[in-house]
């Protein structure tokens, strides 16, 4: 809300670019022991799907069956307001790409061993997905999705204009 207020007051000048995303280490949420919400370090009991608990029942399956930004709205909402999307501006084109998928497999091997049954799962979701959006009024947006890497939480929020960021 503060950044949107600053945009509306013209403090950034003409808006040129935005950055946003969902960058949150969810590896301990995507696997658990079937009774705890998060993975219990040192237990070696890693589950996903029907035998898991809470989000590990459904969230991890997206990492198996999809490859793309599976949660773009988390970050794009505030940027869309700042760029007047659906108020005279619109998304014109999008190009997205993903890195290879390594983080979840490494987490399984590091915590359950190379012979853990989940070590055989083929994860399709790239560890980092980057989407580039071009707006009809000329602005660009970079959206980043990263939930499979060891990292601090970040929405990567950035508004940049002719007068600064």
Model-based region annotation:
Residues 1-122:
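Predominantly a Rossmann-like dinucleotide-binding segment in NAD(P)-dependent oxidoreductases
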